[in-house]
Amino acid sequence: MATREWFVMNAQQTKLALESPPLFAVKKDDDKDHTCDTGEEPYALVGSPVFNPLEDYKREVVSIIDEYFSSGDVEVAASDLMDLGLSEYHPYFVKRLVSMAMDRGNKEKEKASVLLSRLYALVVSPDQIRVGFIRLLESVGDLALDIPDAVNVLALFIARAIVDEILPPVFLARAKKTLPHSSQGFQVILVSENSYLSAPHHAELVETKWGGSTHITVEETKRKISEFLNEYVENGDTREACRCIRELGVSFFHHEIVKSGLVLVMESRTSEPLILKLLKEATEEGLISSSQMAKGFSRVADSLDDLSLDIPSAKTLFESIVPKAIIGGWLDEDSFKERSDQNGGSENLRRFKKDAETIIQEYFLSDDIPELIRSLEDLGLPEYNPVFLKKLITLAMDRKNKEKEMASVFLASLHMEMFSTEDFINGFIMLLESAEDTALDILAASDELALFLARAVIDDVLAPLNLEEISNSLPPKSTGSETIRSARSLISARHAGERLLRSWGGGTGWAVEDAKDKIWKLLEEYEVGGVISEACRCIRDLGMPFFNHEVVKKALVMAMEKKNDRMLNLLQECFAEGIITTNQMTKGFGRVKDSLDDLSLDIPNAEEKFNSYVAHAEENGWLHRDFGCSTDS
């Protein structure tokens, strides 16, 4: 067989051999008189239970996987695996998870793939994922004895891992070189390569092969809630209704049961006693938490205006139910009031949310940042800036990559122009606190939010330390905390800056140096007599608005070197057309300021020229007036 050095962690095997304790313990027999030579052995070998970390790990892992297949709770599975410690054995976990899923239904296969993607880099390292799959390839012959289609199923798991980007595509080529051509493992690679990864639209086909998402859809959940509530109103069986709530298995969505129940009461007054009884019992049994109850009531409060169109007495009925719930002890008054305030309890906030949504939708159509900033300023409610940020990102997450990129670009434009760092922090906290709810409508919400957070750090909208501040505001094992960890992982990855700038197609795929070279060339062409409108078009065509600070920096340096202030005319036109924002201007001027010592070696009057450019920029509104003060200091 060909060498397996790439696959087998020899150091790990050696460590296992060294750390494995003896099978027997040596016990000294102190009861014997050793002054006499009796010819008896003074020591006896006795059987002793011995701690074997790998065996214990294997047992625990099977339990974790079984529980995960039953509950589908990724967070619990990840937490349990981390609590085990013994991370050096995680390749075994990968092998065991996949092999157990291979012998089960499509639901478990999908769950296994989802879990691997969520654990990737955070709990299980990329190398451990790779080694786990190699061990599967090496043992597929044994698996085929119990699972007739093992070759095909494992091929699909590998294809899915490549589509999910937890295995690199080069994995296939490397595996081919190390596996015997006659082995079933080699056949797995061929099937994965030829049957799954070479087909048109293969990513979509592979992702949906086992039925796609393991999560019940929002529409289906709402339908089931409506069905069992209607049945309950007909038969009055509270115990059966509680059983239905349990079987739904969506504790984070119980507020929808509360909301649907209250709406049902408004539509049919005769159902009120039964619905209130059910909500009371569900609370007392711990089925519906106090926070979910408060959330359900606040959702109804938020939609009273719409409900009143079909049910004129909706507001009156709701106001009569709230005191009953509070007096009955199953609605916490403080939680309800607090949540109502957060979710738009005031008329001003409701109106702001509606107006914000309108101007964001217009921005997605026009891509006009200056107009959006003017519209936001016209609203005149800076205290709701975090709410605007939450609305912007939530709407973008439910759209295509183009809108996601536009949202990130706009956040960078808002930075230092309108929004404070505190606004950004509070906005992201609001997003992360509601991540579970958002995930019901946008299944990849957690991953998308992690990208938005990481991108905000790369764009200097947030500092890396701000992630710690945001994390401290969230429950330790919440979805929001997991999203923060994912964002940190994205930021720490190799070439993170370039990859994140192109995560939604924002960049053109060039290297940064290539982009800088193109900027320098277009400025040179303009400097020797180019047309200003053509130069502006070229800057637009770069398609990197978040990198326009480099245009500012190079234009200022060229103006100093060539002793030609014509560059200032170009910057003025770019600013007037909204191509370069105040934020990008500030960043560009700041970069030049930071490099003045080096520039002065070649341009003796660099500082004098720079100060005159700052004065010109402040006079024309490119920079805030306090920029010059910071320069003087």
From Swiss-Prot:
Where does it reside?
Answer: Nucleus; Cytoplasm, Cytosol
**Motif Nuclear localization signal 1, which positions?**
94-101
Q: Name one GO molecular function term.
A: ribosome binding
Q: Name one GO biological process term.
A: response to carbon starvation
Q: Which PROSITE patterns match?
A: MI (PS51366)
Asked whether the keyword Nucleus is assigned, the reply is yes
Q: Which UniProt keywords apply?
A: Cytoplasm, Nucleus, Repeat, Translation regulation
By sequence similarity, the record places it as follows: Belongs to the PDCD4 family.
What the entry lists under PANTHER family is as follows: MA3 DOMAIN-CONTAINING TRANSLATION REGULATORY FACTOR 4 (PTHR12626:SF12), PROGRAMMED CELL DEATH 4 (PTHR12626)
Write the protein's name. MA3 DOMAIN-CONTAINING TRANSLATION REGULATORY FACTOR 4
According to its UniProt entry, this protein's organism is: Arabidopsis thaliana
Question: Upper taxonomic classification of the species?
Answer: Eukaryota, Viridiplantae, Streptophyta, Embryophyta, Tracheophyta
